Amino acid sequence: HAGQDEVRPGQLIMAELDGVLGNDITTPVAIREFEKAGFDNVADADRINIVLDHFVPNKDIKAAQQSAACRKFAKTHDIPNFFDVGKMGIEHALLPEQGIVTAGDCIIGADSHTCT
């Protein structure tokens, strides 16, 4: 994924990604930055994975607004790997369980446990 024979700790690389992962807490932040940057379209909707797994069912109005922002973004950009209430699970387990992530894939995600 790095296009190199070897990488070392601390080295910065430009990795070829198989996908990205966001959840109901981090995706709204990414959406705001996406919009601030002036983007109209996502590069590859098939590589975007959004899982509502932290505050669903929603615990309060803020959580409901965050979920709504994710739903709107997924619908606007035809993101097929959007996992809403009733179709979601723990994001780190869900992607491998659904066959979206397989051995050797390189996925980045906006969550503290993404290394799983």
Which stretches of residues belong to each language-model region?
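Fe-S-dependent hydro-lyases/dehydratases of central metabolism
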Residues: 1-116
